[in-house]
């Protein structure tokens, strides 16, 4: 492993830990060095490799789009185990360039390292729970590595799926699912007889495995419909409205089964499905016009929001949140404004803010902590502990901000007559129970 990767890894792990409220890994790889090519879904751009790298035991090298490798960034990306992959739209001889990259991949696999590849090649502008058609690169690289070693070493391919409740929302949740690996050595005879066919067949097999690790909606235009059913039922992967009695894994499985059920209506759509879709659309449009969130309406309907407990939490967190604001708020505002102005595609915002935050907040606070430690005549280790605690103070600030926002929203909603919306929601709950199977 390169030294910068080793140094940055614990900081990135902390950043991911702070960003997501809960992370669950299913079938996590057992070994750090196992010559495996991980084929992952690309739902959230730069966030995907960050969360996989920090929640996977394996030492990973990342295949990254070549246009981010500039004169300035190339040394840093190299140090972070990133390798460029060239696409036709990059305006270069992709075959020649990728041959060089494939050789580096072969060298990494020969050294018992692992690769993380995103065969879809791109990320949707808007977060959608689906897998786009994948390319053959992962399988091709695996067989190139096997030929280079004269088939003496085992090379594996495994599907990995990142399931976000919402990737750009801090304190949301994430479930990472890993498939059992495919050993490419088992296909030597077929490969030597007809390499093109075997690569195509195995790519299809990997695509099926990748879909099994995530929620996959065939019809892109039904993504909103799928999300709305999850919100009303409370059983799915929505990050705001969900039943807390269901574990994240159960909610993920519900999301998958719901999508698979909707995918069965590829040709003829039953009248009751179209009717439900229309009713949901009307309900959420009225919520939007009223500037009300469904989670708040549900809390009011169920009388589940306790303003007193929320106020106690705010008071308890206030001293720590104040320290968090003093140490982090100004850099945070700079990062937020810079990222949202620089990157037009919002899919990049969450990961870029997280990475920039890790570096800029550290650079901003190191001299402050050093001066404080010296001024108060404290030993180095006290300053170090305080520096680490700054991230917890910032988390307190984020938590108190969310609680205050909820308090303001709930105070506002209490003044509204929401009877009509409550009745609409109750009717939708009943309709979903009647129409959607009990998964």
Residue ranges and their predicted role:
Residues 94, 215-223, 266-273, 300-303, ...:
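General structural signal for secondary-structure boundaries
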Residues 3-197, 206, 304-305, 321-439:
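Soluble catalytic domains of membrane acyltransferases
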Residues 197, 204, 208-298:
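Long, charge-rich alpha-helical interaction segments
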Residues 137, 201, 314, 318:
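Short, well-structured alpha-helical interface segments that form or flank functional binding sites
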Residues 263-342:
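Membrane-proximal, non-transmembrane alpha-helical segments
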